[in-house]
Amino acid sequence: MLLPDLHPYTILLSIFIVLLLKQLVASIGKSTIKEFVWLVYLKVSSNQSIKTYNSKQHELHETNKEKRAISAQDEYAKWTKLNRQADKLSAELQKLNQEIQQQKASIDKVSNALLLVLTTLPIWVARVLYRNTHLFYIRQGIFPKYVEWVLALPFLPNGAVGLTIWMFAVNSVVSNFAFLVSFPFAKKVSKPVRDTKIE
């Protein structure tokens, strides 16, 4: 199989960036990212059903406002007409909402696929393609033989460090750094209070 001839440091940096991106996605949350993509889609889309939904929603709001302004007892005919119009608009909005929800589901699928392609797929492809690549070497004698053997996992000679160990190390460092950065902004936990016995 022909592999792209990448310098080991290119692999190191690429995997570092992908793992950093993966940690960023985990910190922000996939649902937040999908919601942001949906909001951007709503802003830039020229979809007619979204525009129709917004105009009908505005029309319903105005109709309800007008309906509340008049008395049902004093102007029954006008109030009934407005009530029918509001019911009709509500039914149309419900249909449009179902269409928009289907569009949202398809946008969510695309967002999920894009997140998968950007964060998970490169890691697995790199693990398969570059599992035998020596990323860097450690001088002999720095670590005991069994540590050198562990660092050389899965298929490398002692003294070499491969992609698996590099990914493990980068993941640990990035997740710990993300924790240290997010810890001061985390929600404070109240101090536990000991229950006192009442006799």
UniProtKB/Swiss-Prot annotation:
Identify the coding gene: GET1
The portions of this protein that span the membrane are: 12-31, 116-136, 161-177
Kindly give the InterPro entries that the UniProt entry links to this protein: Get1, Get1_fungi, Helix_hairpin_bin_sf
Q: From the Swiss-Prot or TrEMBL record, state where the protein is found.
A: Endoplasmic reticulum membrane; Golgi apparatus membrane
Entry coiled-coil feature ranges = 66-116
Instruction: Kindly provide the name given to this protein in its UniProt entry.
Output: Golgi to ER traffic protein 1
Question: What is the membrane topology noted in the UniProt record heading this document?
Answer: Multi-pass membrane protein
Similarity comment text for this entry:
Belongs to the WRB/GET1 family.
